[in-house]
Amino acid sequence: MIQAETRLTVADNSGAKVLGCIKVLGGSKRRYASVGDIIVVSVKEAIPNSKVKKGDVMKAVIVRTKKEIRRPDGTYIRFDDNSAVLINATKEPIGTRIFGPVARELRAKRFMKIISLAPEVL
């Protein structure tokens, strides 16, 4: 469950290290986002000479959350961190590599490029 002001780690090699959630997209009253949802983020920390700079405002898709996700078969999955992947206007990842596992729910949301780049899909 990600909401405004939440800090997230970055699961790609775009150059950003820490993101801050500004807004959860999907209606003015929407408060929380989960895996596969798109949020507006600000880059809080970035490495030098990278594609993104500190203070950049962009969109990101959530790939891991600490809050467990209930699957249709009754099982739950949760991760050790809240992580996101930066995306461009066409919903393609900015980075060329994804680090760590990602949730299977991304496939239903049609983020196939992220699924194919990820080392493990849980």
Curated annotation (Swiss-Prot):
One of its GO terms (biological process) is translation. InterPro entries: Ribosomal_uL14, Ribosomal_uL14_bac-type, Ribosomal_uL14_CS, Ribosomal_uL14_sf. It holds the Pfam family Ribosomal_L14. One of its GO terms (molecular function) is structural constituent of ribosome. CDD domains: Ribosomal_uL14 (cd00337). SUPFAM superfamilies: Ribosomal protein L14. Keywords: Ribonucleoprotein, Ribosomal protein, RNA-binding, rRNA-binding. One of its GO terms (cellular component) is cytosolic large ribosomal subunit. PROSITE patterns: RIBOSOMAL_L14. Belongs to the universal ribosomal protein uL14 family. Part of the 50S ribosomal subunit. Forms a cluster with proteins L3 and L19. In the 70S ribosome, L14 and L19 interact and together make contacts with the 16S rRNA in bridges B5 and B8. Binds to 23S rRNA. Forms part of two intersubunit bridges in the 70S ribosome. This is Large ribosomal subunit protein uL14. It comes from Desulfatibacillum aliphaticivorans. The gene is rplN.
